[in-house]
Curated annotation (Swiss-Prot):
InterPro entries in the cross-refs: Isoprenoid_synthase_dom_sf, Terpene_cyclase-like_1_C, Terpene_cyclase_plant_C1, Terpene_synth_N, Terpene_synth_N_sf, Terpene_synthase-like, Terpene_synthase_metal-bd, Terpenoid_cyclase/PrenylTrfase
Organism: Solanum lycopersicum
Protein name: Terpene synthase 17
Tissue: Mostly expressed in stem and trichomes, to a lower extent in leaves, flowers and roots and, at low levels, in fruits.
Domain of life: Eukaryota
GO BP terms, alphabetized: diterpenoid biosynthetic process; response to jasmonic acid; terpenoid biosynthetic process
Pathway: Secondary metabolite biosynthesis; terpenoid biosynthesis
UniProt family annotation: Belongs to the terpene synthase family. Tpsa subfamily.
Length: 554
């Protein structure tokens, strides 16, 4: 779509024909400023929270090591969003289960699948051979398994953690999806039906912790066998964390208003709250409050720069901006048009603020890792702009190679680690800068998920070719065929990601850092599930954000 807009270049006004995104305005405006004076848990809530935590800790410690009770308790604690309180206890229990895995692989379908999933989820590679006992002579899963609904659901969740070459898990996934869909209309247990419906769309492997926690608390409350201590602790903890997150968003909203970018850059998506939601999906724990704010600021600028390259900037302007980013010096802004000067100077200011904040911990040198990744992202955006203006449709190989940069996920991973403390060492930053396979798989997943749901709208306004157009052009297939193939490619990259998760040396790259990579990928799965929910947040994402960041659990 072409639009005549008046823009300022140098020191005089000129009329330039530009594309328009026609994005809807922010849905939230000043809403979160109302929480500026919000206080955390009062003394009574803090005491209640600590008391409940200790009760749950005792339950966890006292549960017999080799029991289904222990497995189900760990699973419930994690699904209720409480796992971060008991990391050492859970780690110890799962380490024990890993060393005694053969003893756990002789139970029923539910027990075996649950143990398998909990271990793989934690980074322990265990064999899937235990599921062979549930297949017949032809290698198909036995039909009588459909009577065990709980076991079927557990097998479905376990199979999501498959890697390449695990045919039995590929079959398990197809089998459970088909059977659970058939079972659903016949279930008299509405709570279980709701849980299965949610799982079929949002399996645990893909789940954003805070989103799934809110839903699981509701499911758990409906379960007649729920534990009142666990339920009360989950509700209280959810609300205490939500209060902290509201306060953080209040701070971010104040920062956003101070930037005044909305009036200066009307073409860009104004999505501060959605950016924060993305970062909250990366890590929600209270100790990462500063890290979340840093990541939100950089995410916000990635979005603005993306829109600048995608729909607004002319090639000569984008050339100047790319060169300025490479120089990374305030003097480089002098050659930029006014709107780009504002973006550039504000971006450098944000990084200066982050550097000063990290200087208190003698970690300011780490900022250069994020800056270097920002340069790579901008180079990727510029390459897409050159393809667009040159009317070139790249090959899939060319597009995907560039997609590592344009996904911005190495930049987000690197930035997410900046304020995580001593766990994020220089060795970890050096590692991620080499573009290891687990990170590349994450980049490819986000790139392709985004393209599947956004390419039609982007083509209407005249964007560069997405993966869909590249695939259609290279292989002479229809849009529908390209979609099917790209979905298969995404599934293979998830297998890559799962496989690499087991290979990474967690002494050098601790699990808490790897989870940022995995959680960023999960957010992408959620945001791009049915639509581009980031761009069109008024459709469905608004209600989810309200559940997570506005409305407490009563």
């Amino acid at each position: 779509m072409e639009l005549c807009t008046q823009t300022v270049a140098a020191d005089h006004e000129v009329i330039i024909t530009r594309r328009s995104g026609s994005h809807h305005p922010t849905l939230w405006g000043d809403h979160f400023l109302a929480y500026a004076d919000l206080r955390g848990a009062n003394e009574g809530e803090e005491k209640q929270n600590e008391d409940l935590k200790e009760e749950v800790r005792k339950m966890l410690v006292m549960a017999p090591s080799k029991s289904l009770e222990k497995l189900e308790l760990i699973n419930t604690i994690q699904c209720l969003g409480l796992g971060y309180h008991f990391q050492s206890e859970i780690d110890e229990s799962l380490s024990y289960m890993y060393t005694h895995y053969e003893e756990y692989s002789i139970g029923d379908l539910h027990a075996i699948a649950l143990c398998f999933r909990l271990l793989r989820q934690q980074g322990y590679y265990v064999s899937c051979d235990a599921f062979k006992k549930f297949t017949n002579d032809q290698g198909n899963f036995k039909e009588e398994l459909v009577k065990d609904v709980e076991g079927m659901l557990s097998l479905y969740e376990a199979a999501q953690f498959r890697v390449h070459g695990e045919q039995i898990l590929d079959e398990a996934l197809n089998f459970t999806i088909a059977q659970l869909k058939q079972i659903l209309p016949k279930l008299s247990n509405s709570q279980l039906a709701q849980q299965i419906t949610n799982a079929l769309k949002y399996p645990i492997k893909d789940g954003i912790v805070r989103v799934e926690t809110r839903k699981y608390i509701s499911f758990y409350q409906q379960n007649q066998n729920h534990n009142e201590v666990l339920l009360n602790f989950a509700k209280l903890d959810f609300n205490i964390l939500q209060t902290l997150h509201k306060k953080e968003l209040s701070d971010m909203t104040r920062w956003w208003k101070k930037m005044e970018l909305v009036n200066t850059l009307p073409y860009a998506r104004d999505r501060l709250v959605e950016c924060y939601f993305w970062c909250l999906g990366t890590y929600f724990e209270p100790q990462y409050s500063v890290a979340r704010k840093m990541l939100t600021k950089i995410s916000f600028y990635i979005s603005i720069i993306d829109d600048t390259y995608d729909i607004y900037g002319k090639l000569d302007e984008l050339t100047l901006f790319t060169q300025a980013i490479e120089r990374w010096n305030i003097d480089a802004s002098e050659q930029l048009p006014l709107y780009m000067k504002i973006i550039y100077r504000d971006l450098l200011d944000v990084y200066d603020e982050i550097e000063k904040e990290l200087a208190n911990e003698n970690k300011s040198f780490l900022v250069n890792y994020s800056i270097n990744e920002m340069k790579k992202v901008v180079r990727g955006y510029f390459q897409e702009a050159k393809w667009y203006y040159g009317k070139k449709v790249p090959t899939m190989e060319q597009y995907m190679k560039n997609g590592i940069s344009t996904s911005a996920y190495i930049l987000l991973t690197t930035t997410s680690w900046l304020a995580m403390g001593n766990v994020a060492t220089k060795d970890a930053f050096d590692w991620v800068a080499t573009e290891p396979p687990i990170v590349v798989a994450s980049c490819y997943i986000i790139r392709l998920l985004n393209d599947l749901v956004s390419h039609e709208e982007e083509q209407k306004r005249g964007n560069a070719a997405s993966a869909v157009e590249c695939y259609m052009n290279e292989y002479s297939v229809t849009k529908e065929e390209a979609h099917i193939k790209i979905r298969d490619i995404i599934e293979n990259y998830w297998k890559d990601l799962n496989e690499e998760y087991f290979k990474v040396d967690m002494i050098i790259i601790p699990r808490v850092l790897l989870m940022c990579i995995i959680n960023l990928t999960r957010v992408a799965e959620f945001i791009y599930k049915d639509e581009d929910a980031y761009t069109f947040s008024k459709n469905n994402l608004k209600d989810v954000i309200s559940d997570i960041l506005v409305d407490p659990i009563i």
